[in-house]
Amino acid sequence: MTRNSYLKALLVMAMVLFLASCHRDEDAPRLSLKQQQTFSHAIAGSYSGSYAVVYTDSLTTYEKVHEVQPDGSVKEMVAHNAHSETVADARLLITDDGKLYFHNFPCRLLAKIVDVDADLSQALSEFGSIDVTAQYKFFYENTEFVGWSFEPLNLPLTLNYRNERHYIRIAFSNANRFYRFPMKDLESGSFHFESETALQVEAIYEGEQLLQSFTSFDGLGNSMLITFK
């Protein structure tokens, strides 16, 4: 076989695999629009609770370990001198149009991990509470359970320090967490939201400029995990 023939054969094989993959995706079970609407109505509501906040900063030290977790994953780092705080009177609002609101999020907590700029940190410590908005979606998991996840939107803040107005943006993630709910409860209307819902602080920007990025809780560096429970 010539080199050109070999390359053509590889190209054809790659196309076949690509088309087969697309075909499998098209055949995968999906939730209907009616199901998604039913599930959104079932999950919608206002839920009272508290924020359990865990964070690491410059005082935190780390130890390498090899611990097998119940889910089979391996934990390779343990944080010492991490900090925790509980914020009462928190509220989670879930609407039936795909929105999720973490009410009364205390921005002062961000000052505990932002150390790139002392004036910025001070301004955050004096800022009041604000709502963090997210968008959620359902996805098919199996005939018994429905998957659910959300994506936090950037949180815009206008702060005044050094005699100037600064347009700050906080980026969050869902801490790579996914949730599963019994399909029969969502369909019957007997569902009650009881999941511990987590936000992880990812980065802080001024405009498009990255000021400071943060790690996951078991990583090296400043981090913050906020769990509504």
Predicted regions mapped to residue ranges:
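Bacterial Sec-dependent N-terminal signal peptides
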Residues: T2-L11, V16-S46, K229
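Short hydrophobic/aromatic-rich beta-strand segments that constitute the beta-sheet cores
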Residues: G49, F102-H103, F193-S195
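Predominantly extracellular/secreted and cell-surface proteins with exposed
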Residues: A88, L92-L186
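A short, surface-exposed beta-strand/turn
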Residues: H66-V78, A82-S84, D115-F145, T215-L220, ...
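Tryptophan-anchored aromatic micro-motifs
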Residues: S40-V65
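Edge beta-strand at a domain terminus
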Residues: P29, A171-N174, F178, D185-K229
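Mature soluble binding/inhibitory domains
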Residues: L33, Q37, E63-G72, V78-K112, ...
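Short, cysteine-centered beta-strand-loop-beta hairpins and adjacent loop/turn segments enriched
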Residues: V54-T60, R108-V116, L199-S216
